[in-house]
């Protein structure tokens, strides 16, 4: 039995999230159907992070076990030939038995793309969040500083969250404006259900001046979801990258087809 890892990208706007559902309109259902067609045998996948309805995948990682012997490029091209245009396998790589797409991961990175303009753009529908009024980027960055570190993030946790603990370690939140867009980057060991969208809701409240910077610390300390802002829209949220130990040599996400994804790589080079 061989263990194969795949890098997967998808447009989350047309799916009811990642996880398999009875109606079948999920990314997992489509991917496993394509793998079954290509491999001519049922394939069960394990995913790094189960994204919600409307959330996109740039750097999603899955693994599965199979007895078939196929070249890496065959897994990519063969599976893609059975996938809809809204899902694409970017790479395939054999892995040792100890690799696990979910449990071997030590960090996840999400991007949120927010369009700031008086009028919404149909060209960005389901690709970016939208607010009509200017936001204070410096205030949002200052508020984000209150969240860095290991904390109980219950105030940013949905009622449907199945995580065993609300305690997560948030390593980084960056906020950067580029023209009419504000780009957010969130990096943590793991995230709770709706955590990034709930963080976004609070950051936007502060950016609008509806709450002071210090309010973010109060929300965190409250551990009360009702004390925080409403959950923000999923449209601009992307699972950007999953971090693994170097021993597994997991390929970096192929993000060149998404122009705004260079915001953070350009920042790293300056």
From Swiss-Prot:
<dbReference type="InterPro" id="IPR020095">
    <property type="entry name" value="PsdUridine_synth_TruA_C"/>
</dbReference>
<dbReference type="GO" id="GO:0031119">
    <property type="term" value="P:tRNA pseudouridine synthesis"/>
</dbReference>
<dbReference type="InterPro" id="IPR020103">
    <property type="entry name" value="PsdUridine_synth_cat_dom_sf"/>
</dbReference>
<dbReference type="InterPro" id="IPR020094">
    <property type="entry name" value="TruA/RsuA/RluB/E/F_N"/>
</dbReference>
<dbReference type="GO" id="GO:0003723">
    <property type="term" value="F:RNA binding"/>
</dbReference>
<feature type="active site" description="Nucleophile">
    <location>
        <position position="52"/>
    </location>
</feature>
<feature type="binding site">
    <location>
        <position position="110"/>
    </location>
    <ligand>
        <name>substrate</name>
    </ligand>
</feature>
<comment type="subunit">
    <text>Homodimer.</text>
</comment>
<dbReference type="InterPro" id="IPR020097">
    <property type="entry name" value="PsdUridine_synth_TruA_a/b_dom"/>
</dbReference>
<dbReference type="Pfam" id="PF01416">
    <property type="entry name" value="PseudoU_synth_1"/>
</dbReference>
<keyword id="KW-0819">tRNA processing</keyword>
<dbReference type="InterPro" id="IPR001406">
    <property type="entry name" value="PsdUridine_synth_TruA"/>
</dbReference>
<comment type="similarity">
    <text>Belongs to the tRNA pseudouridine synthase TruA family.</text>
</comment>
<comment type="function">
    <text>Formation of pseudouridine at positions 38, 39 and 40 in the anticodon stem and loop of transfer RNAs.</text>
</comment>
<dbReference type="GO" id="GO:0160147">
    <property type="term" value="F:tRNA pseudouridine(38-40) synthase activity"/>
</dbReference>
<protein>
    <recommendedName>
        <fullName>tRNA pseudouridine synthase A</fullName>
        <ecNumber>5.4.99.12</ecNumber>
    </recommendedName>
</protein>
<keyword id="KW-0413">Isomerase</keyword>
């Amino acid at each position: 039995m061989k263990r194969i890892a795949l890098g997967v990208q998808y447009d989350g706007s047309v799916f009811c999230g990642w996880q398999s559902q009875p109606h079948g309109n999920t990314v997992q259902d489509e991917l496993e159907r394509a793998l079954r067609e290509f491999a001519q045998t049922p394939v069960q996948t394990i995913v790094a992070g189960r994204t919600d309805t409307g959330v996109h995948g740039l750097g999603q990682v899955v693994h599965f076990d199979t007895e078939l012997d196929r070249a890496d490029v065959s897994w990519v091209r063969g599976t893609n030939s059975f996938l809809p245009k809204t899902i694409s396998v970017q790479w395939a790589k054999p892995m040792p038995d100890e690799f696990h797409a979910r449990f071997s991961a030590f960090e996840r990175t999400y991007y949120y793309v927010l369009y700031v303009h008086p009028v919404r753009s149909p060209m960005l529908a389901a690709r970016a969040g939208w607010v009509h009024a200017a936001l204070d980027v410096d205030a949002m960055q200052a508020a984000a500083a209150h969240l860095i570190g290991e904390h109980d993030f219950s105030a940013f946790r949905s009622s449907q969250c199945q995580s065993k603990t609300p305690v997560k370690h948030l390593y980084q939140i960056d906020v950067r404006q580029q023209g009419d867009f504000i780009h957010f980057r969130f990096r943590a060991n793991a995230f709770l259900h709706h955590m990034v969208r709930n963080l976004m809701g609070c950051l936007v409240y502060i950016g609008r001046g509806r709450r002071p910077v210090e309010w973010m610390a109060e929300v965190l300390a409250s551990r009360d979801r009702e004390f925080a802002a409403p959950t923000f829209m999923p449209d601009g949220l992307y699972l950007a990258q999953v971090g693994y130990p170097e021993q597994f040599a997991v390929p970096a996400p192929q993000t060149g087809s998404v122009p705004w994804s260079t915001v953070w790589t350009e920042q790293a080079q300056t």
